[in-house]
Amino acid sequence: MLKTTLLFFATALCEIVGCYLPWLWLKRGATPLLLIPTALALALFVWLLTLHPAASGRVYAAYGGVYVCTALLWLRVVDGVKLTHYDWAGAAIALCGMLIIVAGWGRA
């Protein structure tokens, strides 16, 4: 379970970086050269999703829980926004959903 969660976390970081870099270009006037690492991050994101031993839809559903937590971590660390009790509660619920889905992978 820990290996799966860490893999989902790495996957989420790649997806967030792959979305954040073009955001910097479009919203903040950063160089369009950021599209090069964007493409690499998104390609790595897709590849990482293929490393899970479950059906793709089940992987995407479980991944969503870790993505929510990673995005909130990004909100705190990169954007400098303090998390609210609602953020923490939502992250806990999303992570519980991910754990339930992953626990059932071998039983499906």
UniProtKB/Swiss-Prot annotation:
It is found in: Cell inner membrane. Disulfide bonds: none annotated. Its main location: membrane. It is a multi-pass membrane protein. The keyword Transmembrane helix applies. The keyword Transmembrane helix applies. Keywords: Cell inner membrane, Cell membrane, Membrane, Transmembrane, Transmembrane helix. It comes from the Bacteria. Pfam families: UPF0060. One of its GO terms (cellular component) is plasma membrane. The chain crosses the membrane at residues 6-26, 29-49, 61-81, 86-106. Belongs to the UPF0060 family. This is UPF0060 membrane protein KPN78578_15550.
